[in-house]
Each structure stands twice: as C-alpha cells, then as structure tokens.
C-alpha cells in the first residue's frame, strides 16, 4: 500500500513538473511608442464590384491582430471591416501549411501540397486571380515587402512544385502578364546560373524596369512597371517608413486608369519572418505597418465606391499568445509556442461592396472563388 502511495506521489510530482515546463514559456514585453490615430471609415453604399484588393498578412492570426490592437491603445484601421470570417488553411498532404500551399489556395482556389506554388498536387499550372483579371481586360498587380521569389507573390504569377526553386520561379514573371509589381529580390533576376537576364526579358515585353525608389515613384505612364529597388527584402519598418502603403497606393493610382478595373494583391510579408524568429517587437511593428497600409487602402476604397478590400492570411506563424498587457499604455506581454507555422484558422476581413459574402467559416479556396465571382460579375447571384 505504501509503495502504491509513493508511486502516486511521484507520478503527481512528475506531472506537475511536466505541466510547469509545458506552460511556463518565456514571455516578451513590447510597448508601442508611436501610436497612431484611427478614423471611422464609412463603407460605400454601392453593391457592384469593379476592383478587388486582396491584402495578405503573412502568418497573421487573430492573436496578431488583437495584440497589435492592444499595442496601438485599443484601435486599428482593420476594425473598419464590415464583415469577418474564418479560413481553414490545411494543405493536401500536411495539416499545417506554408505560404506556398496556403497562398496558392488563395490565389487559385485549389488546395495543393506543401511547398507547391501556383500548381496542383500533380504539378499542373493553375489559373490565378492575376490571370482572371487579365482575361476580363482588367489590370493586375502585386506589392510586397519580401523578395519577389518568395512564395506569396509567386503564388499569383509563377508555377512550380517546389517553392525553393527560386530562379525557376522568377523566370516565370515575364510570361505572367501582371501589370504592376513592387518588391525586393533583384539578385535572382540577373547573374543567374541559366544565363537568363529576367530584367531584359521584361523590358522586351514592354515593362519599365525600375531599380530605384525615386524612379519608381516618379513613374507616370500607362505601360507596365516592374519595380525591384532592393537586392533582397525591403528594409525593416523603422528604416522603410510607410513604404508598403506608398507603393500600394502607387499601384492603385496606375492601375485605376484601366476603365475596366483591376485586381491587386498586397502583402505584409515580414510578419512571417518575425513570427519564425519569435521576435515580438519587430512582429508588432510589421503588423502595425500592415494595418496602416490597410487604412490607406480602405480610405481610398471608400471614396472609390466600387472596390472590395479583403484582408486575410495564408497561415499562422509562431503560435503567438497574448498573456498580459495594458491597452492604455500600449504594452503587450506575449509568448510563442513554435518557431514554425501553426494549424490555426486565420481571420478574413472585408470592406466595400460584396463584403457580406465573406462571413462564416470556410476553406481558404473559397476566398478565391468569391473574389472571382465578384470580379467577373460585379455581384454574387
């Protein structure tokens, strides 16, 4: 009897130590010292969609959003969304997805395998929202803060079974038909192993290739533009300022000249990086930079009246948990449960005509399907 009691005591002690080790994860604290004002944006009354702007926070979950809300003293531009939903992100061969598979589902409406970009599980190229827009006579563009050979921008313009085949992916851009591109990663466009000079190929296709910010922001003609001012990623948020917002608005300005409309994908790319690094301060700065870009885009969409804005994520990164904080001080205390992606559902927010079609719980492929219907018909019947 005493042996059984001793065994029970030891077992309970082991369980207690295990539980403590499991839940006593190290926390990080961040206080946002540059809080910004947020305005209430009145949603347009129109019902017909002419343009769609899809904004992807790479690795962004509900916890990222609420932590950023707390850091900015209890307000975000994102709160102007008039509809919210939840998206399931699984890949065909793996529950926890990546930006290749998750982004491809958003871009093409097809579930695919882990690491695949713009192709189905058998490697067959898929039709993306860029292709849909072009077939409708609309313009199409992308603006990102990552390298243009990263998965998310490639999901919309390129095709490969393996996202790590970066030079092959970049080689697909000249044939993509995309009208406006802004991002980093110039080093994969020239000096390549295959001898191709992708910048020259783009010029032959009629693109203006911009290698500096001054040239990019001064550009004011109707021909296509491919802007790659950085060899790798764009700079950190403290260094680049509101570059994502400015680049996005430049794309909107240029593509809005097409009377038939446009589709644009904008990505807050580096949220994912700092989720992987478990670096709370930089993660929050990236999330808040993305939110300020959302604000600029939503304000423009409200004035335009025919533009739907959809904000979502391809997956969650870092297993972020907000464990404490103070929204009056802008202080957040968080922990991370992984340095990789998690399998959490991700939020979907919508603003503008057609927003009501993005409520509920659904597959990430449904985001594509609903956007395609709205781009094609202006409404969902």
Task: Describe the predicted segments one by one.
Residues 1-23:
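Bacterial Sec-dependent N-terminal signal peptides
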Residues 151-157, 231-236, 240, 248-251, ...:
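Active-site His/acidic residue clusters
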Residues 109-114, 226-236, 272-277, 349-351:
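Gly-rich Lys/Arg/Thr-decorated short loops/hinges at beta-loop-alpha junctions or inter-strand turns
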Residues 120, 210-248:
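Functional beta-strand-loop-alpha-helix junction segments that form "active/interaction loops"
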Residues 62, 288-329:
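Metal-dependent active-site segment of extracytoplasmic phospho-/sulfohydrolases and closely related
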Residues 22-185, 189-191, 198-216, 316-381:
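N-terminal catalytic scaffold of extracellular/periplasmic and nuclease hydrolases
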Residues 185-189, 193-196, 200, 221, ...:
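Acidic-aromatic/histidine active-site loop/patch
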Residues 130-134, 215-218, 248-258:
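Short amphipathic alpha-helices and their capping/turn segments at secondary-structure boundaries
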